[in-house]
C-alpha cells in the first residue's frame, strides 16, 4: 500500500540538492501547499532559494526546514546510489532521508490532512523553507527572518524538523541550543634562524602559557537546561615547514559552545584580558554564529510532548545539546522554538537512512501539534 509521506520523501531525495542548490525540491513542496490554499512568497537571496508560505490568520505556527543536503561522499560505498531512494528491511535509504527530507515530507502531508479536516482553522499555519542550512547559512533562514522582522510579521510557535531523535522518534526534543562563538587568533613574533633565538621572538613559545591557561578555564557549570560551556581548539598552525626557521606568527582557532550563563561579550572580555596578561602581540577576529536560546515549558512544548506521548507512548527528553540549527535565527522573532524530527544516527553518513514507519508516525505527530495550536 502506498504512503504519501514515503512517496514525497522519495521524490525529494531524487533531487540532488547539494547546498545551496535546491534542485527543484521547493517547487515540489510549493505545488502541494498551493493546492490546499497556502499563499507563497519566494524570498531568494544570492544563490539561495527560500520561501515563506502561510494559510489563515492570527496566532501563527510555522514549520521550518531545509531542502539542501551535504555531499554524498564515496558513492561506491552506498548500498544504493545516494539520490536513488530505496527501501530495505523497512529502512528508507538516500541522502537527506533523515536530514531532513523525511521531515519536510511529513510536514507537507500533515498540513494536507490538517487542512482537509480543519478547512476553517482559527490560527495561521506557515512554512519557512531554505536551501542553505548545511553550508554557509548566510542567505537562508537568517535573511528570511530579518525580512519578516522588518515588516513585523507575527510568529508565535515554530517547529524545526531537524532530526532530534536518538533511538526512536520523539525520544528527544530540542527546546534550545547553545551559542557558538569562534575566535581566529594570530600571535605575532619575529621570524629568525633557530641557531640565533636572541635575534627572533618565537610566537609558539610566547603563546604556550596563554593557551595552557585558556584550556584550563572553567567558564561556567551550566544550569538546569544547558551543559557547561565548552572551549575546544580546532586549528593551530605555525612555521614554514623548515626545521631551521623560527616562525613569525602562530595562528590558533578555538570555538566556544556556550550556555545562557554567559554572553559572547563576557567570553571575549575574558580572552582579551588573558592575552593582555601574557603580554602578547596579537590580532583577533571573532565570529558569532548563534546566540543560545531556550524555549521553556509552554504551549508549544506541551503540544509536542502531548503528540509524542499520544502516538509513541513515551515521555521525551527536553535537551539543548548538539550543534547549532536554524532555530537560533527564528528565536530572534520571539517565537517559541523546538526541534522534532527522525532518528539522527546516520545523518551526514554513508548509507543515510530512516525507518519508513517513523516518517508516517512523524506526520501524525506534526498534525496533532497543528490541531492543538491552530485548529
Swiss-Prot record:
<protein>
    <recommendedName>
        <fullName>Succinyl-diaminopimelate desuccinylase</fullName>
        <ecNumber>3.5.1.18</ecNumber>
    </recommendedName>
</protein>
<feature type="binding site">
    <location>
        <position position="99"/>
    </location>
    <ligand>
        <name>Zn(2+) 2</name>
    </ligand>
</feature>
<comment type="similarity">
    <text>Belongs to the peptidase M20A family. DapE subfamily.</text>
</comment>
<comment type="function">
    <text>Catalyzes the hydrolysis of N-succinyl-L,L-diaminopimelic acid (SDAP), forming succinate and LL-2,6-diaminopimelate (DAP), an intermediate involved in the bacterial biosynthesis of lysine and meso-diaminopimelic acid, an essential component of bacterial cell walls.</text>
</comment>
<dbReference type="GO" id="GO:0006526">
    <property type="term" value="P:L-arginine biosynthetic process"/>
</dbReference>
<keyword id="KW-0170">Cobalt</keyword>
<dbReference type="GO" id="GO:0009089">
    <property type="term" value="P:lysine biosynthetic process via diaminopimelate"/>
</dbReference>
<dbReference type="GO" id="GO:0009014">
    <property type="term" value="F:succinyl-diaminopimelate desuccinylase activity"/>
</dbReference>
<feature type="active site">
    <location>
        <position position="68"/>
    </location>
</feature>
<keyword id="KW-0220">Diaminopimelate biosynthesis</keyword>
<dbReference type="InterPro" id="IPR011650">
    <property type="entry name" value="Peptidase_M20_dimer"/>
</dbReference>
<dbReference type="InterPro" id="IPR002933">
    <property type="entry name" value="Peptidase_M20"/>
</dbReference>
<dbReference type="GO" id="GO:0019877">
    <property type="term" value="P:diaminopimelate biosynthetic process"/>
</dbReference>
<keyword id="KW-0479">Metal-binding</keyword>
<keyword id="KW-0028">Amino-acid biosynthesis</keyword>
<keyword id="KW-0378">Hydrolase</keyword>
<feature type="binding site">
    <location>
        <position position="348"/>
    </location>
    <ligand>
        <name>Zn(2+) 2</name>
    </ligand>
</feature>
<keyword id="KW-0862">Zinc</keyword>
<dbReference type="InterPro" id="IPR005941">
    <property type="entry name" value="DapE_proteobac"/>
</dbReference>
<feature type="binding site">
    <location>
        <position position="66"/>
    </location>
    <ligand>
        <name>Zn(2+) 1</name>
    </ligand>
</feature>
<dbReference type="InterPro" id="IPR036264">
    <property type="entry name" value="Bact_exopeptidase_dim_dom"/>
</dbReference>
<feature type="binding site">
    <location>
        <position position="162"/>
    </location>
    <ligand>
        <name>Zn(2+) 1</name>
    </ligand>
</feature>
<dbReference type="InterPro" id="IPR001261">
    <property type="entry name" value="ArgE/DapE_CS"/>
</dbReference>
<comment type="subunit">
    <text>Homodimer.</text>
</comment>
<dbReference type="InterPro" id="IPR050072">
    <property type="entry name" value="Peptidase_M20A"/>
</dbReference>
<dbReference type="Pfam" id="PF07687">
    <property type="entry name" value="M20_dimer"/>
</dbReference>
<feature type="active site" description="Proton acceptor">
    <location>
        <position position="133"/>
    </location>
</feature>
<dbReference type="Pfam" id="PF01546">
    <property type="entry name" value="Peptidase_M20"/>
</dbReference>
<dbReference type="GO" id="GO:0008270">
    <property type="term" value="F:zinc ion binding"/>
</dbReference>
<feature type="binding site">
    <location>
        <position position="134"/>
    </location>
    <ligand>
        <name>Zn(2+) 2</name>
    </ligand>
</feature>
<dbReference type="GO" id="GO:0008777">
    <property type="term" value="F:acetylornithine deacetylase activity"/>
</dbReference>
<feature type="binding site">
    <location>
        <position position="99"/>
    </location>
    <ligand>
        <name>Zn(2+) 1</name>
    </ligand>
</feature>
<dbReference type="GO" id="GO:0050897">
    <property type="term" value="F:cobalt ion binding"/>
</dbReference>
<comment type="pathway">
    <text>Amino-acid biosynthesis; L-lysine biosynthesis via DAP pathway; LL-2,6-diaminopimelate from (S)-tetrahydrodipicolinate (succinylase route): step 3/3.</text>
</comment>
<keyword id="KW-0457">Lysine biosynthesis</keyword>
Amino acid at each position: 500500500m502506498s504512503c504519501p509521506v514515503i512517496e514525497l520523501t522519495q521524490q525529494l531525495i531524487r533531487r540532488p540538492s547539494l547546498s545551496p542548490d535546491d534542485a527543484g525540491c521547493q517547487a515540489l513542496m510549493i505545488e502541494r501547499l498551493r493546492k490546499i490554499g497556502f499563499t507563497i512568497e519566494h524570498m531568494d537571496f544570492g544563490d539561495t532559494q527560500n520561501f515563506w508560505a502561510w494559510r489563515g490568520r492570527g496566532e501563527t505556527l510555522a514549520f521550518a526546514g531545509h531542502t539542501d543536503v551535504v555531499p554524498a561522499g564515496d558513492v561506491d560505498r552506498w548500498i544504493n546510489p545516494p539520490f536513488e531512494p530505496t527501501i530495505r528491511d523497512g529502512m528508507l535509504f538516500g541522502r537527506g532521508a533523515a536530514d531532513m527530507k523525511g521531515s519536510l515530507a511529513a510536514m507537507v502531508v500533515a498540513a494536507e490532512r490538517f487542512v482537509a479536516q480543519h478547512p476553517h482553522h482559527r490560527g495561521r499555519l506557515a512554512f519557512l523553507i531554505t536551501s542553505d542550512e548545511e553550508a554557509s547559512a548566510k542567505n537562508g533562514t537568517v535573511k528570511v527572518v530579518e525580512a519578516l522582522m522588518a515588516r513585523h510579521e507575527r510568529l508565535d510557535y515554530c517547529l524545526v524538523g531537524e532530526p532530534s531523535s536518538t533511538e526512536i522518534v520523539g525520544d528527544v526534543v530540542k527546546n534550545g541550543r547553545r551559542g557558538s562563538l569562534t575566535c581566529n587568533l594570530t600571535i605575532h613574533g619575529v621570524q629568525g634562524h633557530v641557531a640565533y633565538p636572541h635575534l627572533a621572538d618565537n610566537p609558539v613559545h610566547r603563546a604556550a602559557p596563554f593557551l595552557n591557561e585558556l584550556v584550563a578555564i572553567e567558564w561556567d557549570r551550566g544550569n538546569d537546561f544547558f551543559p557547561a560551556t565548552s572551549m575546544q581548539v580546532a586549528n593551530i598552525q605555525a612555521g614554514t615547514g623548515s626545521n631551521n626557521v623560527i616562525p613569525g606568527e602562530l595562528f590558533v582557532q578555538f570555538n566556544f559552545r556556550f550556555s545562557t550563563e554567559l554572553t559572547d561579550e563576557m567570553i571575549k572580555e575574558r580572552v582579551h584580558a588573558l592575552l593582555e596578561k601574557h603580554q602578547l602581540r596579537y590580532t583577533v577576529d571573532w565570529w558569532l554564529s548563534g546566540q543560545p536560546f531556550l524555549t521553556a515549558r509552554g504551549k508549544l512544548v506541551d503540544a509536542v510532548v502531548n503528540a509524542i506521548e499520544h502516538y509513541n507512548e513515551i515521555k521525551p527528553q527536553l535537551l539543548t545539546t548538539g550543534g547549532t540549527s536554524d532555530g537560533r535565527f527564528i528565536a530572534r522573532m520571539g517565537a517559541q522554538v523546538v526541534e522534532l524530527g527522525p532518528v539522527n544516527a546516520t545523518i551526514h553518513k554513508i548509507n543515510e537512512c530512516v525507518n519508513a514507519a517513523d516518517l508516517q508516525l512523524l506526520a501524525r505527530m506534526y498534525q496533532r501539534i497543528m490541531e492543538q495550536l491552530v485548529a
